[in-house]
C-alpha cells in the first residue's frame, strides 16, 4: 500500500490525532542514498516526524524542515516535508552500522542514541507568509519520537504524545510510520483531556508492533489506541491523502546554482572539464551542465 496520512479527532474534538505511514518513502530513500538498515530507520523516523509536524499547517504549500546537528557517527540529518505529503531528506553517513542494543529479554533495538550522539534538533516551519518560525531543542535520546515530543513541549507548549517506529525483517523495512496525539490549544487546560491522553498512551506497549499489526490500515491503528475517535472528523480527503518521497530539484535549479559561481570559477570549469555535474543532496539525482550552457551563463 502507498504511504499516506490520516487526520482525526477524539474526545468530542478535544484531541487531535494524526497517523502517517512512511514505509515506501523510507525504502525509496534507502535505494537512492544506499542507506544501511540503521540509517534507513533513522531517516524513516525523521520522515514520519516531519510529516506529522507539517500535517497541522494551514496552507497546503507549507513546509517543515527538520535538522539534527550532533556529534554522533551518523553525522546529522536533514529532512524537508510538506503539508502536501511530499518528503525528502538525507543523513551525513549513509553507511553507518552499529551493534544492536539489548532492551529486554531476547529483544534488541538499533542504537539510535549512539548513532546520533549529543546535539540539537532544529525545526523550521515555513508557511510561505512572513518569516519562517525556527526553534531548537537538545536531543533527548536520538530515537526521534522523544526528541519531537521535547520540541512540542518546549516550543509549542502543547500536551502531546509522539510514537514513531518501524518493523525490520531480513529482507529490510516492512513498515515505518508514526502517530501524533495532541490536546488542542483551546482545550489544553482541561485536566480531563490531558489525563485521557496520558491514559491512552500508557496502553501502548510497542508502537512498532501495533503499526505492523494494523497492516497499513492507519484508521485501525488510531481506533485501537483511541476507541472514542470522532468518526465524523474523518473526511474522504483525509483518508486518501498520499505521502511520497518527492524532490524539488530540477535542471533549471541546477543552472540557477551555477549562476551563483564567480565568472572565474565558471571559466576554470570550462578549461579543466568542459562541463559540470551537479548531484542533489536530497535525492542523488544528477544534472549535467554542458559546455554551451556554462558558456551562456558566463556571457549573460
UniProtKB/Swiss-Prot annotation:
Gene Ontology molecular function terms on file: protein folding chaperone; unfolded protein binding
What kind of modification does the protein receive after translation? Under oxidizing conditions two disulfide bonds are formed involving the reactive cysteines. Under reducing conditions zinc is bound to the reactive cysteines and the protein is inactive.
Q: Does the keyword Disulfide bond apply?
A: yes
Taken from the UniProt record, the cysteine pairs bridged by disulfide bonds within this chain are 247-249, 280-283
According to its UniProt entry, the protein's GO biological process terms are: protein refolding
Q: Which Pfam families does this chain map to?
A: HSP33
Sorted keywords for this record are: Chaperone, Cytoplasm, Disulfide bond, Redox-active center, Zinc
SUPFAM superfamilies in alphabetical order:
Hsp33 domain (SSF64397), HSP33 redox switch-like (SSF118352)
Q: Provide the protein's localization.
A: Cytoplasm
Question: Under the cellular component aspect of Gene Ontology, which terms does the record hold?
Answer: cytoplasm
Q: Which PANTHER family match?
A: 33 KDA CHAPERONIN (PTHR30111:SF1)
State the protein's purpose: Redox regulated molecular chaperone. Protects both thermally unfolding and oxidatively damaged proteins from irreversible aggregation. Plays an important role in the bacterial defense system toward oxidative stress.
Q: Which HAMAP family match?
A: HslO
The family this protein is said to belong to: Belongs to the HSP33 family.
Q: What is this protein called?
A: 33 kDa chaperonin
